[in-house]
Curated annotation (Swiss-Prot):
Membrane topology category: Multi-pass membrane protein
Native source species: Mycoplasma pneumoniae (strain ATCC 29342 / M129 / Subtype 1)
One GO CC term on file: plasma membrane
Compartments it resides in: Cell membrane
Top-level taxon in the UniProt lineage: Bacteria
UniProt keywords, alphabetically: Cell membrane, Membrane, Transmembrane, Transmembrane helix
Residues that span the membrane, as ranges: 23-43, 56-76
Disordered as annotated region, ranges: 326-345
Positions with biased composition (Basic residues): 333-345
Protein name: Uncharacterized protein MG456 homolog
Main location: membrane
């Protein structure tokens, strides 16, 4: 980002900018009072001030009122332009640096070319409604305990007749947990059988969950851990996260919706440019907490989703329960990091 002048920093500091616009606004109010007084004295039957003074008040009040309006308009336009200029810069490297500083990570790096394609997104995201970025940002995370996580972050614009809405999701890739071809999702996301999913023609419903399989496949809900489905993937408590699981016999993909503020390095309207790096640090703390919940679900996916039903009596509900709650996105200027809740053992 090019070095900003003191004048530009003034416009990008809400506290100073708001004081300036308030002063200009007060000048406009006094100008309006003077203009009203001048008009009333000039055309009214009882003159409060002489006609000459009334004309002066009309001229001065009108000019000051117009000037205050123009100054406020230009100031707001200039501020909007500067915010756009600042947000054109890619600060992914700074975000990566802040993420790598989190104590649970041994290494956090960006893939030049990762293993996840945007095409893997299920077709209940129709292209006529969702405009996803063509190349998702992909990352490799190594934890202090030796575990690794490969994931991608995808953003999209959801179009509708009333408004356009931003959405985002994380996609993790692991070795296949099953030798069958299936897709697990919420019952309100009907799958359109095209692309990766064209052979998934059969659907089975259990409560609020749908399982798509190939025709005549032996795979069904009985092969899945019910506690994992009920308490983790489709727990109604997790109001800020929707999960989907896709298994294609080679890899298993976990998809989780996340707040659009995930990986947000932009300067927000209510933030000061001088606090930008600090706010990115806070955002990285929040994102690390979200990623921690995501990672817990990925690890459970590897070991719990396809249960060992020969020893089902030894598996308790608490052993397959995790609170993977993704907390509400931050919207104020103080992006405070949020701690993820720990999994129950």
């Amino acid at each position: 980002m090019p070095e900003l002048t003191r004048f530009q920093k003034f416009f990008l500091t809400p506290e100073k900018f708001n004081k300036f616009t308030r002063v200009v606004g007060f000048c406009g109010v006094f100008a309006l009072i003077a203009l009203s007084l001048g008009i009333y004295s000039y055309v009214g039957q009882g003159s409060i001030v002489p006609k000459v003074a009334a004309l002066f008040l009309i001229a001065l009040g009108g000019f000051t009122l117009l000037l205050s309006f123009v100054i406020n308009f230009v100031a707001l336009y200039k501020r909007s332009q500067l915010i756009h200029l600042v947000n054109r810069q890619d600060r992914t490297d700074l975000w990566l640096q802040k993420m790598a500083n989190n104590k649970q990570f041994e290494q956090f790096e960006l893939f030049e070319k990762g293993p996840i394609s945007a095409d893997i997104l299920p077709t209940f995201y129709p292209a006529t409604i969702y405009n996803f970025e063509l190349v998702p940002k992909q990352f490799k995370v190594q934890y202090k305990n030796g575990q690794t996580l490969n994931f991608a972050k995808l953003s999209a614009i959801k179009r509708s007749t009333s408004k356009n809405e931003k959405v985002a999701c994380l996609v993790a890739i692991i070795d296949a947990v099953s030798d069958q071809h299936w897709f697990l999702t919420k019952s309100d996301f009907p799958l359109i059988n095209t692309g990766f999913y064209e052979s998934l023609t059969e659907s089975n419903r259990q409560n609020n969950v749908l399982l798509y399989t190939e025709k005549d496949a032996s795979f069904n809900f009985n092969q899945l851990d019910k506690e994992m489905i009920k308490q983790v993937l489709f727990n109604p408590v997790n109001v800020y996260a929707n999960f989907n699981v896709y298994n294609n016999t080679t890899h298993t993909y976990l998809m989780m919706s996340v707040p659009i503020t995930f990986m947000d390095t932009s300067l927000r309207m209510e933030e000061a440019v001088g606090d930008l790096e600090l706010n990115i640090t806070r955002q990285a703390g929040y994102d690390a907490a979200t990623l921690d919940s995501f990672h817990k679900v990925v690890e459970l996916l590897k070991t719990k989703l396809i249960g060992d039903f020969n020893n089902a009596e030894t598996t308790s509900a608490t052993e397959t329960t995790v609170v993977a709650e993704v907390t509400e996105p931050t919207t104020n200027s103080k992006r405070k990091p949020v701690k993820a809740k720990k999994a129950k053992k």
